[in-house]
Amino acid sequence: MPHVDLALTDVPLNSPFRVTHAGMNLVVMRTESQIVAYEDSCPHAFWPLSEGSIANGVLECPGHGWEFDVATGRCVNAPAYCLTAVTVLSDGHNVRLHWENKQTPAASQRA
């Protein structure tokens, strides 16, 4: 299973952060209470979510403004859509991201 390790301090607070590793683009987000990661692609028009912005626990896609709950990945505008999460492990200093190895990551974006 592919993974990548980061220092927690590498991930900015309340700002989407892009990680590219082993052919996968991921968006990592850290709030005061948690750190989450998803595939870096909006399920609506496949814009990179790492180029979006976070306000009040919501990530806004830079393409067409779709909004996603940072904690759950669920789309606020169209609840049938959600982001594809990757596993995040943290010891308070370091972060490890795990994901399934897929041929076409964007193919499974829709829930």
Question: Which stretches of residues belong to each language-model region?
Answer:
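Short cysteine clusters
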Residues: 42, 61-64
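N-terminal pre-ligand scaffold of iron-sulfur
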Residues: 1-56, 84-111
